[in-house]
Each structure stands twice: as structure tokens, then as C-alpha cells.
């Protein structure tokens, strides 16, 4: 009898324990990180497409607020040092810059992330891709940010 009960429990338990979890994010962070994204150097058409996808990825997380492109300042570098004060006046927490490198059979992205408050580069990375997969490359890059 105990064996039959055990077998019945083993068979029935997984079906009873199965439940669907539905998670809906309706609101982002109360204080999202403020990020300025300079259009990447290189092919301007690809740069616009990359920036659009990456910005949307970051905004959808709810953790980031992206500075409107119309408010971007020219990137100032003096003696190989980024001028951080301009970005601090705009209330930015981070600055993202990058370069698109296109060769015959690859499309690579080099990008840097700067912490405006600490006045230093906090990440420098390279993402490798193929030319006809620009969307995937943009998603990989935004994942790194």
C-alpha cells in the first residue's frame, strides 16, 4: 500500500507543482543612471542604427536614462584626458564613446565607458561581429554597458 501511495505521489506531484510565473515590469528605477552616448566614430549610418538599438536596450531595462542627442556636447579631450566637468554640469553619471571598425568580413566595435563623478575610464571593450548582423552586435554592446 505504501509503495502504491509513493508511486501515485511521485506521478501526481510534478503536475500539481507546475505553475506559470508571470513577471511584468511596469516601472524602472526611481533614480536611473544618467548616460550620455556619443555617436560612435566610423560609418554614420551604422552609428545611428547602433545608437538607436543600444539606447532602446538600455532604456528598456529601467536602470538608465539616456541624454537626448540634441543636448550632446562635443567630445573634448585635452592632453589625452576627457573633460569631465562639462558632462557633470549636464547631470550625467556616465559617458559612452566608441568606434565602428569595418573590414572586409567583420564589423567590430570598440567602446569606452567613463565615470563622470570619479573622472576615470571604467571600461574599455571590443565586440566582434559580422557586417550583416548589426542588430545582434548592438545588443551585445548594450549588454556590456
Model regions: which residues?
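Positively charged n-region of N-terminal signal peptides that target proteins for export
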Residues: 1-5
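Residues at beta-strand starts and edge strands
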Residues: 6, 31-34, 94, 105-107
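Gram-negative bacterial Sec-dependent N-terminal signal peptides
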Residues: 10-11
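Boundary at the C-terminal end of the N-terminal hydrophobic targeting segment
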Residues: 17-19
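Amphipathic beta-strand/beta-sheet edge segments enriched in Tyr/Trp
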Residues: 21, 55, 79-142
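Short beta-strand->alpha-helix linker/helix-N-cap micro-motif
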Residues: 26-85
